[in-house]
Amino acid sequence: MARRRALSTAALAATAALVVSAAPAHAANPSYVALGDSYSSGTGTRSYISDGTSCLRSVYAYPSLIASAKGYDLNIRACSGAKIADVSNTQLSALSSSTAYVSISIGGNDAGFASVLTTCAQPAWLSNCNGAIDKAQAYVNQT
């Protein structure tokens, strides 16, 4: 009887060990990297993440909102004022084989988007809005 109890206890312990080891590990949240310029960083929200940069990254930027809603681990590399070369030189290194999602918005600073806005916000007799738009459009078409 004692031997049978010992065998039953050993079998139960072995089964419990198998069940514990067969349990799936808690899956990590998907990794999401946000690249780009002020459109992605959240410039203009007036509520910025203190990360030691002048990138004006915000908890209200669309990447932050998506990551929060979906449960993604966010690495926001987007930076206010970034140009295409900045993404290539300083942001792409955030991507890895574990990156599940990527978003990017870039090109407005290269094309002179801010100049178009400031030019076209002036009275027509004082500025050349069409010329500013044409210049930006030419840049986009040639890129």
Region spans (language model):
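Secretory targeting and sorting signals
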Residues: 1-27
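Conserved phosphate-coordination/catalytic loops
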Residues: 57, 86, 138-142
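Serine-esterase "nucleophile elbow" of acetyl-processing enzymes
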Residues: 27-78
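Alpha-helical cap/lid subdomain in secreted, periplasmic
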Residues: 92-143
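Extracytoplasmic/secreted cell-surface and envelope-processing proteins
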Residues: 42-44, 84-87, 111-115
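Residues in and immediately flanking transmembrane alpha helices
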Residues: 18, 50, 72, 118-120
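Catalytic-core regions of hydrolytic enzymes
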Residues: 79-99
